[in-house]
Amino acid sequence: MAKYNTYTLENGLRIIHLPSNSQVVYCGYDIAAGTRNELSGEEGMAHFCEHMSFKGTARRNAIQIINAIEGLGGELNAFTNKEDTVYYAAISKEHFSQVVNVLTDIVFHSQYPQHEIDKEVEVICDEIESYNDSPAELIYDEFENLLFEGHPLGHNILGNAEQLRTYTTADALRFVRRNYRPEKMVFFVYGDIDFKRLISSPKFLDVPSGKAERGEIKRGLNEIIDTSICSDPLPPNLGGTYTIEKSTHQAHVMTGCQAYAYTDPRRMTLYLLNNILGGPGMNARLNLSLRERHGLVYTVESTMATYGDTGIWSIYFGCDHHDISRCRKLVRHELDRLMQKPLSPQQLIAAKRQLKGQLAIACDNREQFALDFGRSYLHHGHERDLETLYQRIDAITAEELQTVACDLFAPDHMTTLIIK
């Protein structure tokens, strides 16, 4: 793989570039401003500002923003999660300079006009309603809210309709000026561009300079606030079973627990364990048991997410209401197997081979790969390196897998949410 180029501008903005011989360039701003950066009373604000950033700057209205990139055959998009807001684009390399110009404009110079807010809030409220109508999606947010109740990590990314309708231009500017700061973001580029020209681009000079000073929160648009990760104490792991009644045709069940932070060395062990148990392969143990052997579910999967100071691991399945208990017992059986019996040498080799193959295929998705190495550099200060991942996977032992299983999968450690 080609070597990464990195550079930090005087204003604190970090730039990371990975060369490629493709005619297409993938690039964007990854900003450390997700839902966990919302203060009390700002729930949903990170996602709200992401939407509103496309509604006009001092130089471009909403239509001009879209046409500036899509009119050249490019793609412009954005998303918000718990720790990030990302604005990104794909464009043919001859139009790369135009993309830098537009992305920089919407990130640093959006105006959030009230008349556009009044319209876009209703769009987001429709998005919330659509989400609420899909319990298979809703359960992920409800489960995270349950595990992290009272903590910003438990905030629903979309927010709630009642609060969204109170937001104003001043509210949006306050959040953005606190969080959209050069030292809190990375500009990532994956493509065939001249790195020296990139870091000397005048487009990057059109960015606020200087770092925020730590201090007390002040009222007004130019408040100063600590820009570090939210330091609110994490709630204790919950445990128990909780039910949301929605009169659904199918029952939706999620069980899991708080898990490991990105920097925890056990993270990669859980990554392999998760793939064995409920990864995307049809040979995952949960799929073989609940779907192939017993025909009780269409979808069963386990997932994990890592944050700066914690993580989350969970299993999801959907089944008929009368099969909930049986499915839960089968899930418990698979968890107990991993706790009680280490993998054989042959099983361990096969599991590692499968995960490494999946990672290789995932890296072939160029857009997702660019997003991944941008996030890695923003939050952890290093590049995404497939060979290093392979080495970490190869070093995992059967005993380490069993230890992590015992640490996380104990019955009294698990929280279960049922929507039915």
Regions found by a protein language model. Name each.
Residues I16-Q23, G28-D30, E213, I217-N283:
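His/Glu-based metal-binding/catalytic segments typifying zinc-dependent metallopeptidases
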Residues K3, T8, Q64-D226, P233, ...:
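Charge-rich, well-structured scaffold segments of protease-associated domains
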Residues G12, P19-I69, P265-L277, R285-L288:
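Active/ligand-binding-proximal structured segments within catalytic/core domains
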Residues I16, Y26-D30, S53, N77-F79, ...:
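Short, conserved beta-strand segments within well-ordered enzyme catalytic domains
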Residues R14, R36, K55, K246, ...:
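Basic side chains
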Residues A2-Y4, L13-R14:
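Extreme N-terminal starter segment of soluble prokaryotic enzymes
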Residues H47, H51, H151, H252:
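Histidine-centered active-site/metal-ligand motif
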